[in-house]
């Protein structure tokens, strides 16, 4: 009996027992043959050079009538030979000490690694295990730490994930200060150690420009040169030698330095004005309105200013105000708000309702119209509300397609009817014209052939000629003879 296998894997004793049993081999020979396998199992499966031999898990296989074993061995499904590990993947924090181009390693092989710069210097190894995988290299290399950063003056440092190699920190300044320098730093390799790639920034006051001066007045503060975030200045109007007021201070008397972007300082508002007594500055701006009165820098007592709202807006309050003492306008200024000008029809059959249409629209607003399925839009799909309450262009209509088809059918029917009448009239006129021509020919024949002694004969001949469909030569000769 011959036992063969295309695989290089060792034969299992169970397979051999079945094979030799079927071949009629004596029991003594069979036991002698199986003895090496049994001893090998007792020795723990040690192979040559002290490497551990890897055995595949048992698989059910049968010897079929074709004298072949059913089922493929597990090693046939491996991308590498049994008892080996594939080359390990590249480690992110370490490199191999001895470089090799081997693509696989026997079980029990160990490889030496050393940690990369930026990590605490050390060596370690990974080993090919019995299951053809490598021991873990995780946490073998520990990242070095940069020195603990300190808060900048008038600022803060923000540590998010730590201060180890590769970490990033951020700096911010307190309110009223701006950052000079880099707002972040990264722990990087420097020579044989690690350190932050940039120095800590500086936080300085946000500066403001000198406050603007005003006619007939001045500002007062703790300094006249350096102004920074949070400082306050106060304005006053000039007085006479006795301290009597000559002007009225109009506006906010105090301004403070602030910032909109955290970089550049600005004053909180415009400076006040010092105006003559019993005068008024122009009234404040009224949104969506125009001032009809003459625009002047100053108004006298009891001067009147009138307002008018823009088209499409409705005024609330008095349309005119009067200048009063201490730069006050009375009554209260009016306001202009959008008025409901245009409305959609209550009956909107055939229109789509999901387009955000409203029942009422303000001046200048647009409405978009679309028809539902089965309807046709007649007119523009968009209309705008006008100041007089009308729509421009006029609102479109949604007409049912069945009605449109009926209208088209009626129109075509009318055209066909007119054409039929025209053809009928044409045929009648043509027929009358032909009859008129025949009568003329008959009259000419009578005049040519008229004779007193042959009236009866000629009349009979003409009647006979009309009733006949063809004219014979004999009849022509007879007519000539009579004439």
Swiss-Prot record:
Q: State its location(s).
A: Membrane
Tissues expressing the protein: Ubiquitously expressed (at protein level).
List each copy of the Sushi domain by range. 83-143, 144-205, 206-276, 278-338, 340-400
Q: What happens when the gene is disrupted?
A: Death between 9.5 and 13.5 dpc from developmental arrest.
Which Gene3D superfamilies does this one have?
Complement Module, domain 1 (2.10.70.10)
- Coiled-coil stretches noted in the UniProt entry, renumbered to this chain: none
Task: Give ranges for the Extracellular compartment.
Answer: 41-405
Q: Which Pfam families match?
A: Sushi
Asked if the keyword Acyltransferase belongs to this entry, the reply reads: no
Residues assigned to the Cytoplasmic compartment are 427-483
Q: What family does the Swiss-Prot or TrEMBL record give for this protein?
A: Belongs to the receptors of complement activation (RCA) family.
Report the protein name in the record: Complement component receptor 1-like protein
Q: Write down the species.
A: Mus musculus
